[in-house]
């Protein structure tokens, strides 16, 4: 019997839903999906954060005035009722806390948040410095008002707290699962943990400063459930941190990447690197670790280590240049990666009788034209008037040209 040719459209692929408009005219670093609303916050070199609707893909609000240089990172605080709380990190070496009441979010107009609506470049250190200098020159030019009538909304964002302590650019911010702790990391090689005292006066207290990394710390990420922190660095390592008797310390150091580790994500750990690889790491049960486990040679065991992590797999290699970001879907378990080659790659884990295998489901080359893609995130959205329970998951990517694109997965 002759083989049946399936039309290309029937194969698993990514399909562009929309660009978020209007975009920033400068480099966009990262997109942070809101934990419960169909909105995202994007971080730009023009010192602003833009908040967009994933229902109609339009700009809802522009947050500005808190940082003196590029906004590199942002994260929404979880488990907040009645308002949205956003943490930001900037090249000006500070982190900021922004607040906005959500009471108007139940409206049905396009302006509402309502649920039923609407790095580097082998970004090596020298290249990242050059990018930062370019950002500064751009910021000295005339600023662009892209708010499209959102000025009234902008006034409702309150710059509540400035967290000052790092000596250099803040590269990543991340809230703990409880929302009571905020981790920040910096080019100064340090990781800070701040506690939200939740006293009604916007007070934060520094509870730990960790300086074991030997290079720029690119990313921090919390375990989805436990108060366990992972960090990734220019020193090619991933480090795991826990609190013991009110003292935070390193409990594991993962080695295996042969270049800067840019990003971390997921319930296990998925990491990506300058070495063009994406790797998955798994924590061994304590009983197995105590018995000796498999003794992966890529794992160092610092003094007092109470956890053993092993490299579970290296995903199929697709990227030709540095991989800057990975995202693990909570809904489907799919992984997405992006990087300097402009590709979006989707991977799926397939459980076999003997071993687990990761396969490539889709590759979208040139997703942002000739530009490098700095970040990728999975986000939930629903069309206007659609039942929220039927919301879909989309992929949001940000790039050097300032564009933010929303893709849907077809046949995945």
UniProtKB/Swiss-Prot annotation:
Which Pfam family, just one, is annotated for this protein? WD40
GO CC annotations, alphabetized: cytosolic [4Fe-4S] assembly targeting complex
- What domain of life is recorded for the organism? Eukaryota
What SUPFAM superfamilies does its record include? WD40 repeat-like (SSF50978)
Q: What Gene Ontology terms for biological process does this UniProt record contain?
A: iron-sulfur cluster assembly
Cite the repeat ranges for WD: 20-62, 66-108, 165-204, 212-255, 257-291, 318-357, 367-407
Keyword ATP-binding among record annotations: no
Q: Which UniProt keywords are listed?
A: Repeat, WD repeat
What function does the entry list?
Answer: Essential component of the cytosolic iron-sulfur (Fe/S) protein assembly machinery. Required for the maturation of extramitochondrial Fe/S proteins.
Similarity annotation: Belongs to the WD repeat CIA1 family.
Instruction: Please state what the protein is called.
Output: Probable cytosolic iron-sulfur protein assembly protein 1
UniProt organism field: Aspergillus niger (strain ATCC MYA-4892 / CBS 513.88 / FGSC A1513)
Name of the gene encoding the protein in the UniProt record: cia1
């Amino acid at each position: 019997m002759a083989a049946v040719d399936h039309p290309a459209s029937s194969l698993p692929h990514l399909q562009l839903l929309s660009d978020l408009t209007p975009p920033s005219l400068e480099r966009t670093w990262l997109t942070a999906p809101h934990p419960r609303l169909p909105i995202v916050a994007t971080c730009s070199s023009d010192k602003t954060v833009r908040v967009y609707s994933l229902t109609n893909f339009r700009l809802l609000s522009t947050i500005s005035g808190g940082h003196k240089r590029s906004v590199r990172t942002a994260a929404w605080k979880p488990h907040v009722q009645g308002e949205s709380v956003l943490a930001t990190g900037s090249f000006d070496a500070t982190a900021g806390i922004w607040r906005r009441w959500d009471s108007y979010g139940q409206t049905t107009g396009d302006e509402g948040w309502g649920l039923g609506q609407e790095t580097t470049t082998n970004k090596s250190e020298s290249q990242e410095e050059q990018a930062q200098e370019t950002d500064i020159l751009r910021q000295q030019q005339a600023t662009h008002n892209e708010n499209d009538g959102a000025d009234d909304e902008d006034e409702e964002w309150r710059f509540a707290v400035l967290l000052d302590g790092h000596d250099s650019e803040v590269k990543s911010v991340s809230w703990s699962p409880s929302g009571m702790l905020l981790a920040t990391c910096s080019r100064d090689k340090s990781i800070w943990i701040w506690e939200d005292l939740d006293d009604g006066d916007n007070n934060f207290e520094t509870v730990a400063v960790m300086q074991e990394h030997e290079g720029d710390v690119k990313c921090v990420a919390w375990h989805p459930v436990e108060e366990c922190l992972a960090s990734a660095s220019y020193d090619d390592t991933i480090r795991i941190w826990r609190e013991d008797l009110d003292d935070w310390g390193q409990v594991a150091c993962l080695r295996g990447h042969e270049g800067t580790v840019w990003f971390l994500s997921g319930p296990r750990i998925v990491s990506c690197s300058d070495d063009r690889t994406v790797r998955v790491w798994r924590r061994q049960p304590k009983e197995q670790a105590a018995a000796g486990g498999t003794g992966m040679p890529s794992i160092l065991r610092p003094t007092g280590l109470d956890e053993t992590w092993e490299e579970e797999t290296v995903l199929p290699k697709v990227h030709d240049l540095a991989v800057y970001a990975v995202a693990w879907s909570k809904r489907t378990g799919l992984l997405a990666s992006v990087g300097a080659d402009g590709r979006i790659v989707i991977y799926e884990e397939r459980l076999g009788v003997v071993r687990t295998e990761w396969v490539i489901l889709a590759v979208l080359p040139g997703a942002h034209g000739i530009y490098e893609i700095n970040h990728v995130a999975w986000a939930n959205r629903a069309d206007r008037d659609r039942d929220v329970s039927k919301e879909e998951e989309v992929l949001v990517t940000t790039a050097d040209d300032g564009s933010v694109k929303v893709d849907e997965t077809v046949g995945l």
